[in-house]
């Protein structure tokens, strides 16, 4: 189970009443205090993340959740599932000082453990807990949320609640999230995903994305090896200078994954990343593909579905089973994501940040985190671009592949709550 205690340990400190570490390693600095509200967040002094959790008192006035249903431009097909519309859960938390935080629990069948109905029930339980709790420190609130929404089983809902809480706190101390997470940058550049489609459709999408300024295409593969190669050839013809990420979503056997790399090698194509080539529980196969991909073809392999907890991350690191870990908040929660970031950075493993099929609420939170930390080699935060409607008001600014984050408090996105039914 992820806990605030384990997070504090990863930050180089321990929760009271335990003695603090002798060699603290703060993960990030945060800006401002509640007393500094209204000041310029770029000009205020800093204090450590653990201090915010230990000193900021959270007093929840209202907390509620509603279904967040949004149509897609086209069905989103990957090796393990097909999504025809987004059926997520929106979460709204209001503090006693009037600051409102927004979160989203993304649901992707066969990837997240929850479906929408389960997520609604568990989110409601968490909201009731928050409403009925007395004022307590942020760290304790997050720990209580983790207890009622434990492990990977409820990670997506936990992430949504954590997002809303942290967004509200950021607004209360008058800082944007990218500053809260370290302030490394106020923008990111994302790839864009081409789902499993025909070679003609893939070529059409690649041509469109090229005109929109996307230099990195993430191609979903893993259902049919021959068709995957044909799609790659079609994309290469219309976007010859693009960088490729292959994402098999567990779809290949180890020998098939290596065969794909061999065929691409013959075409003169080297992907910059090969994501989750084999089944999540095929640890031996993952390590084998990673060794061959890097040693023979110079291709890095990322663990996505195989990394659903800090325990998984440690296993991957110890066994040299992948070159990159893909952090998705819906898999591990926000607190869990921070734990894995610290573990990976300490070990020298590269990091990727991704998401499920989400609106700009969840994607905005993840984008702020990525910009603030500045430590992600691969950024895959594109799925709001696949939606036919955008229910989120304000938030980050989009210019092709670039997301720009402003100085607005929190992640700055919100919903017209009366129209979220």
Swiss-Prot record:
InterPro entries: Dipeptide_epimerase (IPR034603), Enolase-like_C_sf (IPR036849), Enolase-like_N (IPR029017), Enolase_C-like (IPR029065), Mandelate_racemase_C (IPR013342), Mandelate_racemase_N_dom (IPR013341)
Binding sites annotated in the UniProt record for Mg(2+): 247, 275, 304
Cofactor: Mg(2+)
Superkingdom of source: Eukaryota
An MF annotation (GO) of this entry: magnesium ion binding
Keyword Iron-sulfur: no
Binding-site residues, substrate: 193, 218-220, 328, 380-382
GO BP annotations listed: peptide metabolic process
SUPFAM superfamilies noted in UniProt: Enolase C-terminal domain-like, Enolase N-terminal domain-like
Disulfide linkage: none
Keywords, in A-Z order: Isomerase, Magnesium, Metal-binding
One Pfam family from the record: MR_MLE_C
EC primary class: isomerase
Endpoints of the signal sequence: none
EC number: 5.1.1.-
Cofactor note: Binds 1 Mg(2+) ion per subunit.
Listed PANTHER family: O-SUCCINYLBENZOATE SYNTHASE (PTHR48073:SF2), O-SUCCINYLBENZOATE SYNTHASE-RELATED (PTHR48073)
General remark: Part of a large, functionally divergent protein family. Protein modeling and substrate docking were used to predict the substrate specificity, prior to biochemical analysis.
Family label: Belongs to the mandelate racemase/muconate lactonizing enzyme family.
Protein name per the record: L-Ala-D/L-amino acid epimerase
Organism, scientific name: Populus trichocarpa
